[in-house]
């Protein structure tokens, strides 16, 4: 074994750390006012956090995208494979967990749970070594990230144009220089919203749109052609994630950049999007697509194919911190004196848990967010707040 270099240095301080315990936290909070996107109504927000405790009591934290009550049992399944293993061997552990459920969970809940574990392992590694994750990934390429405001959901009461235009003004007044509108409520409705928002906020603010796969390719093309003149930054999830050919048709028909990938998983899942040139912008979610380990691989693949990467984010401060650490290490694509930089998706809709569970909220100033530079994710968890929202 030593001849192969597998045990060299493992007796030195800092070269290994055994995992002592895995803890899961299912969190939930009711919303003051329900809201909807093109697929469903939300009456509550939830989160699944994972805490991995290493030797010496050091903890790392991660978060899983997706339904917390369904993802938690997968973490329970992974736990015996993790306890006693070397927490610093992030890639080895990723492969171990993925291969264990490979025949049953190449996408979906198994990978979302794996994502949370992977993020927690990177947080633990960074805390153990005294470095932020972006330094362990070879960065930073940037120390602050431009954020765009996500929100613009539908409510049960009031006229959508009234409250959505007011929200657009509010986001711009708060300092955001780009916003993302939720579409998928009918082509005419979507066009009216885009036109009204562009007129209200002017040409100096970026507008992206997201249909959350509410259309088929012909409808998405009709919609896209009617809003092309509004200088749309990208058209996100125009068609269902399974419809690769539909993505290609929409991309070929429109001048608006096409974005997608929040409902895709692992490098193998993203490979067809790259090889078939189905999108212009990839959007892996760090808490869903396989964690920091896998999203860095996906980003490097995208770089080789000349595609931009803007990670999807829709979680708590843990998810935001993980995305910021990843974005800080993403390569410029293409490289240039003044390159197009990746953006941070910063959800502005109601989420009682989001910032409550971290001791120092992540904030934007003039539309920019600083990348946390303390060890690991760079955040501290408020355990009292976690217990306040915990239901399991």
Annotate each predicted stretch with a short phrase.
Residues 52-128:
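Metal- or metallocofactor-binding catalytic centers and their adjacent structured scaffolds
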Residues 63, 114, 182-186, 212-213, ...:
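Glycine- and other small-residue-rich loops at beta-strand/loop junctions that grip anionic moieties
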Residues 16-61, 65, 350-358:
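Structured beta-strand/loop patches that form or line metal/cofactor-binding pockets in enzymes
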Residues 6-16:
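Short, Lys/Arg-enriched N-terminal segments with co-localized hydrophobic residues
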Residues 19, 57, 78, 117, ...:
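Conserved, mostly hydrophobic/aromatic
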Residues 375-392:
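Extended hydrophobic packing segments that form well-structured cores
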Residues 72, 225, 231, 242-259, ...:
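Shared catalytic-loop signature of beta/alpha-barrel
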Residues 138-254:
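Metal-dependent enolase-superfamily TIM-barrel catalytic cores that perform enediolate-based chemistry
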């Amino acid at each position: 074994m030593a001849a192969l270099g597998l045990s060299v240095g493992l007796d030195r301080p800092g070269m290994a750390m055994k995992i002592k315990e895995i803890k899961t936290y299912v969190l939930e909070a009711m919303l003051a006012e329900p809201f909807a996107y093109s697929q469903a109504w939300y009456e509550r927000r939830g989160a699944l956090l994972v805490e991995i405790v290493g030797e010496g009591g050091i903890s790392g934290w991660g978060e899983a995208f997706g339904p917390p009550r369904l993802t938690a049992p997968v973490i329970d399944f992974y736990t015996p494979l993790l306890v006693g293993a070397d927490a610093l061997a992030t890639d080895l552990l990723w492969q171990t967990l993925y291969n264990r459920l490979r025949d049953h969970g190449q996408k979906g809940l198994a990978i979302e749970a794996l994502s949370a574990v992977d993020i927690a392992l990177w947080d633990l590694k960074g805390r153990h070594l005294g470095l932020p994750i972006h330094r362990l990934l070879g960065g930073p390429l940037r120390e602050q990230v431009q954020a765009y405001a996500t929100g613009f959901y539908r409510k049960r009461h009031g006229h959508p144009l009234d409250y959505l235009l007011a929200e657009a003004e509010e986001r711009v007044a708060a300092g955001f220089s780009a916003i993302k509108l939720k579409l998928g409520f009918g082509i005419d409705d979507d066009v009216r919203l885009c036109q009204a928002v562009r007129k209200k906020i002017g040409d100096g603010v970026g507008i992206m749109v997201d249909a959350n796969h509410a259309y088929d390719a012909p409808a998405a093309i009709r919609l896209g052609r009617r809003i092309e003149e509004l200088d749309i930054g990208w058209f996100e999830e125009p068609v269902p994630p399974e419809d690769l050919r539909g993505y290609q048709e929409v991309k070929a028909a429109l001048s608006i950049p096409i974005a997608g990938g929040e409902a895709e998983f692992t490098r193998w899942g993203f490979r067809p999007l790259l090889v078939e040139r189905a999108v212009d912008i990839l959007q892996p979610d760090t808490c869903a697509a396989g964690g920091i380990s896998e999203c860095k691989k996906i980003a490097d693949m995208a770089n080789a194919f000349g595609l931009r990467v803007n990670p999807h984010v829709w979680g708590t401060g843990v998810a935001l911190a993980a995305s910021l650490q990843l974005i800080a290490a993403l390569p410029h694509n293409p490289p240039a004196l003044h390159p197009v930089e990746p953006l941070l998706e910063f959800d502005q809709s109601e989420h009682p848990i989001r910032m409550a569970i971290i001791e120092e909220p992540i904030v934007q100033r003039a539309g920019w967010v600083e990348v946390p530079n303390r060890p690991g994710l760079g955040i501290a968890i408020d355990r009292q707040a976690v217990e306040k929202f915990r239901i399991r």
